Amino acid sequence: MNGRDILKDLSFIDPGYIEAAAPMPVERGNDGFRHKFLLIAAIAATLLLLTGAAAYTKWSSSLEAQYRLSEDSKKQAEQSGLSVTYPLETAQVDNSGLSATDQGITVSVKQTLIDAWSAQIVLGIQGFELPDGVYPYAEIGQTTFDGGEFHGYGMNHEFYDGILVKDDGTYAYEDGVSPEEGHYTDSDVEEVHFYKGRFNLPDGSMELTLTYRFAETDGSMLGRNLELHITGFGQTTPRGRAWEDNDVLVSGNWDLSIPLHGTMETITKTPNYSLPSGDISLVTASIGPMSGGLDFRLDCPLKGVDTPENLAATEEMESRVPRIAAVRLKDGTDIPVWDTDLGYREEENCFHMNFRISENFIDLSQVSALVFHDRMKWSGKPEDSIIVPID
């Protein structure tokens, strides 16, 4: 294939311009210059359009639905390194580790969102389809980092179900239709229904999103490879709200090696703010674009935290550590977050809490405060929130 053939394959360039610009040995003079100019113009148009396309990389459907970001926010996430997208033709290069095929099913990495605390990895699955409304299942083996032990607090995964949350808080499929109701299989389950998802995308593929929370939050996880081992695909039958049957329909081996490229962007503040309870202070707040960590110091240390006689006292103290609800920006906007885990460090006499965003990303240059809710006394009224300034 020569340069002329490549340009013809780009449908947005008029083939007539390409033919007119082709070298013609018998022609001389100014007309030949015109042909060269047309060829240069065609190439310039190609580069301009390709550059513009790169600035607006298509995000995965699941992350688009979860975060509902503006184009500017997506562009900032890409420029900072928080978001990395993998076009299908790139992921499926032989021996890249970004794609695997077995039993007619291909699994490829589509997009990652990674900061110092956590990672979201979106996989595209081609060749495995289920009827609409049937919840897919993936059997995932042990996850390792660079072939070694997984260092994290946990991992969860879910398939994109095609159900969106509208501005008024109601639900709809992507085409605007209200979602169809499903019913749990156990007759004695009190819950009436759930919503049936549309898991097949227009091209017939599915998306599976995996979320990892790192144990080491100093950035040492970035740059490593996460080895993922999938051993089967099937379906899930929901029997109750937290009770389901998983059936593997296709067994195989899909091994991926996913580079943890992300951002170390972080702000760390030391508010030393005494909370209303009077015996707990927020000492340190470290915040990244999509997750972060907080340290609360107790006035009186808890002794023997793991002993049965002090378990009740420890649980009571945990209930008194407020729940983080949002990161507040300088313009008054609240970015909703939720705490993912809470643990006591006896040697430091502090509780450590990690949190993640639930929508949108955090503009670190605009952070002004943290919003907390008392776990025991929260009334649901904004005026009862605990506001901790950190700017």
Give the location of each predicted region:
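Disordered, charged N-terminal biogenesis/targeting segments of membrane/secreted proteins
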Residues: 1-33
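Generic secretory/membrane-interface signal
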Residues: 8, 38-40, 162, 197
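Solvent-exposed, non-transmembrane amphipathic alpha-helical segments
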Residues: 26-30, 54, 129
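Alpha-helical, hydrophobic structural elements that either
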Residues: 55-391
